[in-house]
Amino acid sequence: MKKVLVASAIALFAGMNAQETETVGFNMGDTFITGAVGFNSQTTGDVKSNTFTIAPSVGYFVTSNVALGARVGYINSTDKNTVANVELSNEVNTFAIGAFGRYYWMPASRFSIFGELAANYANAKNTVKAGSISTDSKANGFNIALAPGINYFLSPNFALEATLGIVNYSSVKPDVDGAIATDNFGIGLDLNNISLGLVYKF
């Protein structure tokens, strides 16, 4: 019986050790998916706000250190309030599509650092309602962003990912004749711009 237990323990240890030494990280030819899914609800006074976000991304390693990819996104944001028995609401639906390139340092290790350059195009529709009266407006825009990030592999296929936006340029223009675009440029470390996600490599 003891021999069986010892043999089982050795087999278990060997399996764990093999799993630990199994290749982790990224290599040329690897494909990965990542992204964000979230829902947030907040009430401030009489105003109730809901936000739903889904933004998947897929990338492919064209070399040992460079990955190219594409992403899509959808955000629904709604604010509701009641004033003088009239229900007011402000809803924004945003659709986005973009591409990105990443350069990885130490890509074939459990822990890696990368820099990402991304460009995105977005279309937003804003619907404002006051009782039975409704007004729609649309806007188009794009942005270019530079962000450093890190990956930590929990297993050969799953990793945690964090990115921090430090440089961002955006331009938004209402979808009406004669509209003027609003440009914005920002640089700096802002902890509010940290994005966390889960990566699946296959």
Question: What are the roles of these predicted feature ranges?
Answer:
Residues V4-T34, Y103-W105:
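Outer-membrane beta-barrel biogenesis signature
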Residues Q19-Y60, S64-R71, N76, K125, ...:
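Short glycine/proline- and aromatic-enriched beta-strand/turn motifs that initiate or cap beta-hairpins
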Residues G29-T31, K48-I54, E91-I97, K138-I144, ...:
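Residues that define the transmembrane beta-barrel architecture of outer-membrane proteins
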Residues I33-G35, A70, A99, I113-L117, ...:
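Membrane-embedded beta-strand positions of outer-membrane beta-barrel proteins
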Residues T44-F52, D79-E91, A124-D136, N140, ...:
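Outer-membrane beta-barrel translocator domains and adjoining extracellular loop/strand segments
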Residues G59-F61, R102-M106, A122, N151-F153, ...:
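Structural signature of outer-membrane beta-barrel channels/translocons
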Residues N65-L68, S109-F111, Y152, N157-L160:
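Repeated loop/turn-to-beta-strand initiation elements of outer-membrane beta-barrel proteins
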Residues S77-T82, G149, L154-F202:
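Predominantly the C-terminal beta-signal and adjacent terminal strand-loop region
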